[in-house]
Regions:
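Conserved alpha-helical scaffold segments that buttress catalytic/binding sites
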Residues: 2-266
Length: 266
């Protein structure tokens, strides 16, 4: 169980749903261990948040457990989408814990937001990668099949074709050096927030599948999550693997908790 997630399903305002998919990782595998590692390393955190004057155990968080992958990624994503959509229909905010970034496709389809906001080192705008259209490098492309707009925060690498796609009017890219000064302005739009832990510099979170230097510090990511959370109707944190001493999992778990605190306070 995610520490502090003591609510039962009927009373839950938030639901942690593990999604340990590790099917299309192209460099360092291990994202299947992400949900387990977040639950483990979150044991070290205090219950109380001084930013919002709230305790995590008072915020009606439920842990659904893990939705285990099948051999068919498309089938798995549809089942995961249904699981997350059921929580939405119950008035519960889904908090997906990956697993590779491909699980975000299920989250976005379940929430059906106007705006997709993502902290990520990569553009993820491929239509297909390595012959696979359901790949961690295609997530923003699939998100834009649902959302009207994508805001990619901290993106610093991609193919020439991806950068061409990112130059179109429905995509906003905020470079790492500008993220701290970025201010969300969504109006009445619904929002989905995804956190790929590789948005962080590898010196901060080395335990991820495709690390990319010159990234964000943890404090900047924390501020983004807190700023976006009040407008968000769904959240995920993804791409944590088991190839470090817990740095990536600690950051990811802390950002999930920051989302809950800020959303409940908003």
């Amino acid at each position: 169980m995610f520490p502090g997630a003591r609510a039962d399903r009927e009373s839950a305002a938030y639901a942690v749903v593990g999604a340990p998919l590790d099917a299309s990782t192209t460099f360092q595998p291990g994202t299947r261990f992400g949900p387990r590692r977040l639950r483990h390393f979150a044991q070290a955190f205090d219950d109380f948040d001084h930013h919002t004057d709230q305790s995590f155990t008072d915020l009606a968080v439920h842990d659904h457990g893990d939705v285990h992958p099948t051999d068919d990624t498309a089938e798995y994503l549809d089942f995961l989408r249904g699981t997350l959509a059921d929580y939405r229909e119950e008035g519960t905010v889904p908090l997906t814990v990956g697993g590779e970034h491909t699980v975000t496709v299920a989250g976005v389809r379940a929430v059906d937001p106007d705006v997709y906001v993502c902290l990520d080192a990569h553009l993820d705008l491929y239509e297909a990668y390595a012959g696979n259209d359901l790949n961690h490098a295609t997530v923003a492309h699939h998100a834009l099949e649902v959302a009207d707009e994508a805001v990619l925060l901290g993106a610093r690498t991609g193919s020439d074709g991806e950068w061409d796609r990112a130059a179109e009017g429905d995509v906003t890219v905020v470079s790492p050096e500008d993220v701290a000064d970025w201010t969300p302005d969504f109006g009445d739009c619904s929002v989905y927030l995804s956190v790929d832990i590789d948005a962080a510099d590898p010196s901060v979170a080395p335990g991820t599948g495709t690390p990319e230097p010159f990234g964000l510090d943890g404090a900047t990511m924390h501020e983004v999550v807190r700023a976006v959370a009040p407008a968000a109707e769904g959240f995920d944190v993804v791409e944590v693997n088991d190839r470090d001493d817990g740095q990536a999992a600690v950051l990811a778990a802390k950002l999930l908790r920051a989302f809950v605190y800020a959303h409940a306070d908003g």
